[in-house]
Amino acid sequence: MLLPNILLTGTPGVGKTTLGKELASRSGLKYINVGDLAREGQLYDGYDEEYDCPILDEDRVVDELENQMSEGGVIVDYHGCDFFPERWFHIVFVLKTDNSILYKRLENRGYNEKKLKDNIQCEIFQVLHEEALASYKEEIVHQLPSNKPEDLEDNINQILKWIEHWVKDHSS
């Protein structure tokens, strides 16, 4: 059976991982967190002193994921999307969180002041939404609110419904 590939993207702290893991457990799709994948495989290309974090080696990440993506049935979670091949994804969801809620979430993660400010600005200017629209066909890019627990449940149900329709439309 053909299964779709889904991209969950958005600023750090918007709830991609929570949504992705829950979605995978309810849909049977495979969940991949690109940050974890990079950590496990040391898929880095240096270190960013200013942000105090490793720099992702995007080419190696793409190489690492290629086979799984071509098989289908994968949920990918990452706070960027412009380096993934367009052909990989059947739908892209950009999660969006109110700035005050996002600020608290990132503060709880121990983000330093610069990282906090930059991520909040990223959300204000909808950088990830713009990046998704520039990287994929507009009709497959959707924004989802991610502020409260009810949003999580609504988003899961909406995406599960979409998966069901996609599978039906693509079965022989």
Swiss-Prot record:
Cellular localisation: Cytoplasm; Nucleus, Nucleoplasm; Nucleus, Cajal body
One example GO MF annotation: ATP binding
EC number in record: 2.7.4.3
Reactions catalysed according to its record: AMP + ATP = 2 ADP; ATP + H2O = ADP + phosphate + H(+)
Any one biological process term the GO annotation gives: ribosomal small subunit biogenesis
Coiled coil: none
SUPFAM superfamilies registered for this protein in UniProt: P-loop containing nucleoside triphosphate hydrolases
KW Cell membrane (keyword) present: no
Gene Ontology CC annotation, any one: nucleoplasm
List of residues binding ATP: 13, 15-18, 109, 148
InterPro entries: Adenyl_kinase_AK6 (IPR020618), P-loop_NTPase (IPR027417)
Main location class: cytoplasm
UniProt entry tagged with the keyword Cytoplasm: yes
Keyword entries, A-Z: ATP-binding, Cytoplasm, Kinase, Nucleotide-binding, Nucleus, Ribosome biogenesis, rRNA processing, Transferase
Region of interest: NMPbind: 33-56
Subunit structure: Monomer and homodimer. Interacts with small ribosomal subunit protein uS11. Not a structural component of 43S pre-ribosomes, but transiently interacts with them by binding to uS11. Interacts with COIL (via C-terminus).
Family: Belongs to the adenylate kinase family. AK6 subfamily.
Function comment: Broad-specificity nucleoside monophosphate (NMP) kinase that catalyzes the reversible transfer of the terminal phosphate group between nucleoside triphosphates and monophosphates. Also has ATPase activity. Involved in the late cytoplasmic maturation steps of the 40S ribosomal particles, specifically 18S rRNA maturation. While NMP activity is not required for ribosome maturation, ATPase activity is. Associates transiently with small ribosomal subunit protein uS11. ATP hydrolysis breaks the interaction with uS11.
Protein name: Adenylate kinase isoenzyme 6
Lineage: Eukaryota, Metazoa, Chordata, Craniata, Vertebrata
